[in-house]
């Protein structure tokens, strides 16, 4: 049973997924929403062009609930992390726009979740970091790889080994966040940001562009022509 309460609902073509688990939205299960549940919801809501992920209340998520580590064996922790990694890989490869609305603390697994999104809109009071080294471990859900791709290998290495917690402005200067907002505006600005991107394009166009860029990142060569053909058929094949 997943003890993290994650709610997803639709606002027109924009879906909002909210993480809720106490004041700090701790991730007591790496699979903070069941992967199959998320995919089923998106299948049942085919009008969805964008997904915004946020944390309820003051914080996005302070990451793993480390108090549970003592009660679990290494094997069960590893199995749970594999589920969490698979979920974040799924979010990263969704063929729709994904935006994290980062309010307050966004640490460890919380930042790993945010980095699985294509964009991160942060409150001016947000703090972000992969802080796992403080607890004697390293990020286990793909966060090291994603951070390296986003900010570069050298900056990622320094951040991870020092467990550095960045201000929103510093994260912006490094390219870790897309935009910094006023203290309480991260979520409304993220919703507006998503709406501005998707409002004038079709779902076919969104799918084509995102799938092409994902394939390029994954090492596939020349994936763009198939995407062009898909949009060509939609635009002129009637």
Q: Where do the language-model regions lie?
A:
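C-terminal long alpha-helix characteristic of the crotonase
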Residues: 121-126, 177-223
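Glycine-rich beta-to-alpha active-site loop
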Residues: 88-135
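Hydrophobic/aromatic residues within transmembrane alpha-helices
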Residues: 53, 65, 113-115, 171, ...
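Short helix- or helix-capping micro-motifs
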Residues: 63-64, 147, 155-164
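Conserved CoA-thioester-binding segment of acyl-CoA-metabolizing enzymes
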Residues: 1-56, 89
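Well-ordered beta-strand positions
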Residues: 119, 158, 162-164, 170, ...
């Amino acid at each position: 049973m997943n003890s993290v309460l994650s709610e997803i609902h639709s606002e027109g073509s924009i879906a909002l997924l909210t993480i809720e688990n106490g004041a700090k939205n701790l991730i007591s299960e790496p699979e903070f929403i069941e992967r199959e549940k998320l995919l089923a919801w998106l299948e049942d809501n085919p009008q969805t062009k964008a997904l915004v992920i946020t944390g309820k209340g003051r914080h996005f998520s302070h990451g793993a609930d480390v108090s549970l580590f003592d009660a679990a064996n290494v094997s069960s922790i590893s199995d749970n992390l594999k589920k969490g990694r698979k979920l974040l890989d799924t979010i990263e490869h969704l063929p729709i726009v994904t935006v994290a609305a980062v309010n307050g603390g966004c640490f460890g697994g919380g930042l790993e979740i945010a980095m699985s999104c294509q964009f991160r809109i942060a409150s001016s009071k947000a703090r972000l970091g992969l802080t796992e080294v403080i607890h004697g471990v390293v990020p286990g859900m793909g966060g090291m790889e994603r951070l390296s791709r986003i900010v570069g290998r050298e900056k990622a290495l320094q951040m991870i080994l020092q467990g550095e917690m960045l201000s929103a402005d510093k994260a912006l200067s490094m390219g870790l966040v897309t935009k910094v907002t006023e203290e309480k505006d991260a979520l409304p600005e993220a919703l507006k940001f998503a709406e501005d991107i998707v409002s004038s394009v079709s779902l076919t166009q969104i799918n084509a562009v995102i799938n092409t860029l994902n394939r390029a990142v994954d090492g596939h060569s020349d994936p763009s022509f198939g995407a062009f053909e898909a949009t060509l058929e939609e635009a002129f094949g009637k």
